[in-house]
């Protein structure tokens, strides 16, 4: 980054992104997690559009649009969950969901909450931002986004799957299907890519699919875990 312009802005937003990431992993309730997710959406947007070229800005705006829409859908799901459970504390939500005889009535709410996390993780069909964003961002930003941004989305998926729908076979099957499609699609896109950074981006998307498959398996295995 020594020869790059806007270095001070870059490092400032890198620290903000790292701080938001720490907030996500240290949060004890879903609403606090959501707040830090949205902070990360805007700080990582600046990292993607660092070069300020036309295609760079368009790619960054695509990412921001997906992130904002995903965040709004997740917020709707959080409101609905709070109305049902009266809390968004993760430990209390786990106890609440385990006390329900029919968790299927919460599937729609779970999908809404998952939507924003899936957008961050780059899951199909919300992956449209990922290849271009990784390609146009500076190499240090691409590395940061690859190791942090998508993994926070995976962390959100783990929260929904293991806190709300632990050992739920139907939910696990749904997550498993998303993981398989993401894994295969990412690999296919990587094979046909002619840009090295885009190839690595699509490969990262495929690897996310592998992780999501593992999350889905905990539901399918059920009480055998």
Where are these regions (language model features)?
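Alpha-helical transmembrane segments of multi-pass membrane proteins
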Residues: 12-15
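Hydrophobic transmembrane alpha-helices and their helix-loop junctions in integral membrane proteins
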Residues: 1-8, 18-33, 43-225
């Amino acid at each position: 980054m020594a020869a790059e312009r806007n270095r001070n802005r870059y490092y400032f937003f890198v620290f903000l992104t790292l701080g938001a990431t720490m907030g996500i992993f240290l949060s004890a309730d879903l609403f606090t997690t959501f707040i830090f997710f949205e902070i990360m959406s805007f700080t990582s947007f600046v990292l993607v559009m660092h070069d300020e070229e036309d295609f760079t800005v368009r790619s960054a705006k695509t990412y921001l649009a997906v992130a904002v829409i995903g965040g709004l859908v997740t917020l709707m799901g959080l409101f609905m969950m709070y109305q049902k459970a009266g809390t968004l504390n993760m430990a209390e939500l786990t106890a609440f969901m385990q006390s329900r005889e029919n968790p299927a009535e919460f599937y729609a709410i779970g999908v809404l909450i998952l939507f924003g996390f899936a957008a961050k993780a780059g899951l199909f069909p919300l992956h449209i931002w990922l290849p271009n964003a990784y390609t146009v961002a500076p190499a240090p930003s691409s590395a940061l986004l690859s190791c942090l941004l998508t993994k926070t989305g995976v962390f959100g998926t783990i929260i929904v799957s293991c806190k709300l729908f632990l050992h739920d076979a139907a939910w696990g099957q749904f997550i498993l299907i998303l993981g398989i499609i993401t894994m295969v699609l990412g690999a296919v896109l990587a094979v046909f890519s002619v840009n090295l950074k885009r190839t690595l981006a699509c490969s990262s998307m495929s690897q996310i699919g592998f992780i999501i498959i593992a999350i889905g398996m905990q539901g399918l295995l059920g009480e055998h875990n």
